[in-house]
């Protein structure tokens, strides 16, 4: 059984999506996958980003790709890992930029739940993965679903900040109305690309400056 319950404010916004043929196919695919493979995150955490940041609470969107595929890493929030799990390299680089940008101490835990509670929606474009197989659930329907999520956030809200790291995330800018929202693009924080412009991109201070300029409360980024 795949547990796909979603927080009530999101359920209301996405109700039509859950009835569509592609989503039924995606559910069938996940049921079959679960019989044969270990999947991450646990099915009860697939929609953890939605549970942690209700629709009306979203102020910032940080877009990831697919979940971490190592044991105990993924828990449904993009880039975040469970307490007690060493932060992966991309997250270490995010924390380095956090320190260099706004002076936060480097967090000891890689759990970003406190950001989610501050209105930072930590969305992966694909919400499940096979253990040890990156991108194994690519092009199975999740992208259609998360594109709709991004588009609906853009349409129904205003003055959001969308933080898009890396080319795949950057391509999602076409779903966002830049007259209503701030889009911040930079290279991915992965060690392969972080020195090509991720470091020094100042996403945290730029986000807070924008929110303050719109009369909104800045994010408490320090963990």
Curated annotation (Swiss-Prot):
This is Uracil-DNA glycosylase. It comes from the Bacteria. The keyword Nucleotide-binding does not apply. Keywords: Cytoplasm, DNA damage, DNA repair, Hydrolase. HAMAP family: UDG (MF_00148). Its EC number is 3.2.2.27. GO terms for biological process: base-excision repair, AP site formation via deaminated base removal. Excises uracil residues from the DNA which can arise as a result of misincorporation of dUMP residues by DNA polymerase or due to deamination of cytosine. GO terms for molecular function: uracil DNA N-glycosylase activity. It is found in: Cytoplasm. InterPro entries: UDG_fam1, Ura-DNA_Glyclase_AS, Uracil-DNA_glycosylase-like, Uracil-DNA_glycosylase-like_sf.
């Amino acid at each position: 059984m795949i547990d796909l319950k979603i927080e009530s404010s999101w359920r209301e916004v996405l109700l039509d999506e859950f009835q569509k043929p592609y989503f039924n196919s995606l559910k069938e695919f996940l049921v079959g996958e679960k019989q044969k493979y270990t999947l991450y995150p646990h099915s009860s955490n697939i929609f953890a980003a939605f549970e942690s940041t209700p629709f009306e609470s979203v102020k910032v969107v940080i877009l990831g790709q697919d979940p971490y595929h190592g044991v105990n890493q993924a828990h449904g929030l993009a880039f975040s890992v469970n307490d007690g799990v060493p932060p992966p390299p991309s997250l270490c680089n995010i924390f380095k930029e956090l320190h260099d940008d706004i002076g936060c101490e480097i967090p000891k835990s890689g759990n970003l739940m406190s950001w989610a509670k501050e209105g930072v929606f930590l969305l992966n474009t694909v919400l499940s993965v096979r253990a040890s197989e990156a991108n194994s659930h690519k092009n199975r329907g999740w992208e259609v679903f998360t594109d709709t999520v991004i588009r609906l956030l853009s349409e129904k809200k205003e003055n959001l900040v969308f933080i898009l790291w890396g080319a795949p995330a950057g391509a999602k800018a076409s779903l966002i109305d830049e007259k209503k929202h701030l889009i911040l693009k930079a290279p991915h924080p992965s060690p392969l690309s972080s020195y090509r412009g991720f470091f020094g991109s100042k996403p945290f201070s730029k986000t807070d400056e924008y929110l303050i300029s719109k009369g909104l409360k800045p994010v408490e980024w320090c963990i």
